[in-house]
Each structure stands twice: as C-alpha cells, then as structure tokens.
Amino acid sequence: IYTNNKMKTKVYRFCLMVVMAIVPLAISATTAYGSNDKDIVRNCTAAPNGEKRCSYALKKEYQAVEHRISNKLLLLRPADDGVFVDSESKRAYANTIRNILLSTLNDAEIAVISRGKANCLNIKIGKDGKALLVEMVLGEDCDNIISQSHIKKVLKRVARVKANGIRDLRVNQYYDYYMSIVATQHSVR
C-alpha cells in the first residue's frame, strides 16, 4: 500500500509538471499577435436580401495605441469609412493590393518572386478601427529569395501609388494592437 501511494504521488507530480509546462505555451500562442476576440467589437445587421453583414473594429482603448515601425506592415486608409461589411469586400481589397503590388514591381523583381513556391509572398488584410492593415508575409520558401529590406523598398514604392479609390497609402505607421481577422490569402506568383 505504501509503495502504491508513493507511485501515485510521483504520477500526480509528473502530471502537474506537464500541465504547468503546457499552460504558458498555450497562453503565449493565443496572444502571439497581440490581439484576440475580446479586443474586437463586432456589429452585425441584416441586409435587405437577408444576408448578415458584419463590421469589425478594435475597442477604443486600442485604437490610439500607435507604437512602433514594422517593415512588413502597410497601413492604408480607404476613401470611404473603411468598414468591412462582408468577405467579398475583403477579397476586393486583397485583389486591389495585389494588383498595386504587381504594378509597382518591375519584370526582374516579379521573376525573383516567381522563383519561390506558392507561399513565398502572401498578402493578408486585417483591420484596426477605420484603417486597413495589409501584411506582407514571407513564407519559409522565400527566406533566401527576398530580403526584408527588399520588401520594405517595395512597400515604399507601393505607398506612392494611388489606385481604385484608395487614398493616403502610407508605410511605417500602424497600431500595435490589430485585428487577427484575415482576408483570403493571395500569393504573388
């Protein structure tokens, strides 16, 4: 009986250690992007055709947190109030950004990107208040093909382009807390 109790104690201690090791990892995984559902205000209304349309915004306390510069994020403000109403709007913005990016690259740069695999360079669209966030994501297959400085150069060139009703396209400014809601990814091939 004594041996069994001793073994039970060891098992309990081991299980406790495992749980204590896993919990911090789980917490850090959910907060890796500095944003989760509790930071987001969602407003949904029914459209005349019965379709549910939702807009998303960060809570006010996060909207004013302007923090640091990133060479991977591009902040752009659309000509309207910038509220996404449905996934189709998100997709339209994603396509617009993809087209702007392609139009600012020269043939040699497009060829360099094309040598990567499909997930070499992806475009994600998120939202912070009334501004849109466009994130240029370098995939693992792209590490040795395109440098961070190259992406920054491309983004600065994109920032000078005005197209499809989008104005005030700017780089090097974004809010630290941003929505993790992401549009469909588009690979630049």
Regions found by a protein language model. Name each.
Residues I1-C44:
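Bacterial Sec-dependent N-terminal signal peptides
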Residues T31-R189:
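Charge-biased low-complexity segments
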